[in-house]
Every structure is written in structure tokens, then in C-alpha cells.
């Protein structure tokens, strides 16, 4: 199959998690490149959703656990950015949400499906947070979707989780990782930039599985910065 570069495209992307960290980063980068964007939201009247409207993003009402609404949301679009929140819904529901979106993309002929998984998803860890995303990856491959799988490591923004940030403000970096252990992190914005790059250069990125990391430091090295 031959793919053409789609820079400065007038094609539309569906972004899930658009009011969240990863989806929001994708929105920022794709708007800067003048793409047309559609955001799936359960509540079109929410503050976050209305902020998107003000930036020119089309809203479509739907729920990732409702296959019918997901299929409607994917009609007539070029690409999908797929991300689900394990911490909000748990492993079983996260898997179903991811599979529902992949199934809908297959039915409606989506041309590029970018899925945000997790670093090490393929390593049979037995940990729910990893295994749930691996199951979604397997569905994407089984369907034969033209896909790019991004596997980001831990988020730099986790340092702003309440308990961690409080410790930092008191001069302590509270983290269970050993002090001599190198620890990979990545910023949400970098994930958005990689997703944007994948959508603009499908000939390079479709069929790729990419682990994403922005830094590799010990906690003392991080604290020193």
C-alpha cells in the first residue's frame, strides 16, 4: 500500500481524551498544523469541551463504552488518536473502550489509527495497567488497521501528583524507585508531537510500534535539576 504525505491536510482527525493530558497535547499540535479536529466527549457542555469549541474543534457526543456512538463519531474521518484512562475506569473497561474504538475505525474505513499504549506493553508483565493496553494492541493488529502504536514511558507530569508535589515543595522527592536506578520519563506534550508527526508522515509511521522516552535519570539527578 502506498501512503502519501498529508502535511497541511484538510482531512479530519478524531481525538479521544481531548480534554485530558495526552489528547489535549495532540489537539494543540494538530491545530498548530491547521488540521480539522473532532473530539469525542460525553458532556458537550463541560468547561473543557467548550474550550475546545472556542479553538475550532468539532464536538461529537459519545461514549467509548457505547459502540454505536463511537461508530458514528468515526464516520467520515481520516484518522483517530486513541487513548483510554486505566486509572479512571480500570482494566476491563479500558480494554473494552479501546477495542470498541478500534472496531469502529475498521468498520468506517479510518486510514490511520494512532494508539497510545504504554512502554513495555509487549513484555508479559502480568500487571493490569500494561496487560489491558496489550490486549487493545492485539485487537488493532487482528483487525489489520493501518496503525501506529506509541508506547510512552512514565509521564514527567506525574511529579505534579498531589502527594509527590507536596513532598517536592518540602524538599523531598518521594518516589519508590531506588536512588541509583535510571528512570525513563516523557512529557505529555512530546507524546502529542510524536502523534502529530505520525499523522503527517504516514508512509514512515504506519505499521510502526515506537517506545517513547524523553529522559533517563536517577531520582537524585532529577531532583538536582
Question: Where are these predicted regions, by residue range?
Answer:
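Oxidoreductase cofactor-interface core, primarily capturing Rossmann-like NAD(P)-dependent enzymes
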Residues: 2-51, 65-68, 72-77, 85-99, ...
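Short, conserved active-site loop motifs that form the nucleotide-linked donor/cofactor pocket
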Residues: 56-58, 147
Amino acid at each position: 500500500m502506498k501512503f502519501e504525505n498529508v502535511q497541511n491536510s484538510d482531512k479530519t482527525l478524531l481525538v479521544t481524551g481531548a480534554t485530558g493530558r495526552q489528547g489535549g497535547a495532540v489537539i494543540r499540535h494538530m491545530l498548530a498544523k491547521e488540521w480539522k479536529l473532532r473530539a469525542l466527549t460525553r458532556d458537550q457542555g463541560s468547561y473543557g469541551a467548550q474550550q475546545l469549541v472556542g479553538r475550532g474543534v468539532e464536538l461529537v457526543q459519545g461514549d467509548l463504552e457505547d459502540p454505536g456512538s463511537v461508530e458514528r463519531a468515526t464516520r467520515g474521518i481520516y484518522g483517530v488518536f486513541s487513548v483510554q484512562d486505566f486509572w479512571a475506569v480500570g482494566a476491563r473497561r479500558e480494554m473494552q473502550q479501546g477495542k470498541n474504538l478500534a472496531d469502529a475505525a475498521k468498520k468506517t474505513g479510518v486510514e490511520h489509527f494512532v494508539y497510545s499504549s504504554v512502554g513495555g506493553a509487549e513484555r508479559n508483565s502480568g500487571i493490569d495497567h500494561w496487560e489491558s493496553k496489550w490486549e487493545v494492541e492485539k485487537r488493532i493488529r487482528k483487525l489489520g488497521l493501518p496503525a501506529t502504536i506509541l508506547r510512552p514511558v512514565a509521564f514527567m507530569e506525574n511529579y505534579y501528583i498531589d502527594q509527590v508535589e507536596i513532598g517536592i515543595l518540602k524538599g523531598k522527592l518521594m518516589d519508590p524507585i531506588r536512588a541509583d536506578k535510571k528512570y525513563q520519563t516523557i512529557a505529555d506534550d512530546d507524546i502529542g508531537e510524536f502523534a502529530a508527526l505520525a499523522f503527517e508522515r504516514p508512509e514512515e509511521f504506519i505499521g510502526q510500534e515506537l517506545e517513547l522516552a524523553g529522559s533517563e535519570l536517577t531520582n537524585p539527578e532529577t531532583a538536582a535539576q
